[in-house]
Amino acid sequence: MTKILNLARLDRKLKRLPTVAKAEIKSAMEAAASEIVAMMKSLVPVDDGALRDSIGWTWGKAPKGSLAVAAVKSGMAGDLTLTIYAGNAEAYYARWVEFGTKRHENAGKFAGTQHPGTTARPFFYVSWRANKRSSKRLIRKGMRDAARKVATGG
């Protein structure tokens, strides 16, 4: 029969792992989101600054009227959902800047006139794709650090 030494101590460490891991992962997710948001703000075309100022991240769902880049959900807990977004009631045109518009005929006050369309000025998904790999790396590092911290008794 095999006897495991210090089983109670190991059990205590394993029980502490989820809380320590959650804090480390949350910190890593915040750092990754801040990097992505900073890149988005540097790439967005600026007229009056409303669109640039509307870019951000939040825990949970994006504010109403905004365009969400991605919602990153942790497999550990449902409360670790981080959403990166752009646009709000004032900067409602975020998706038009990101994807552009096609040529169309105006209606309303300027009915019958032609709008030439606008070219896409991507800032949103470009930033997400450029930082996706490093963000995952940061989160994995957070998990490793949490396991290491629990193992050393920290």
Where are these regions (language model features)?
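Short, Lys/Arg-rich flexible segments
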Residues: 1-94, 99-154
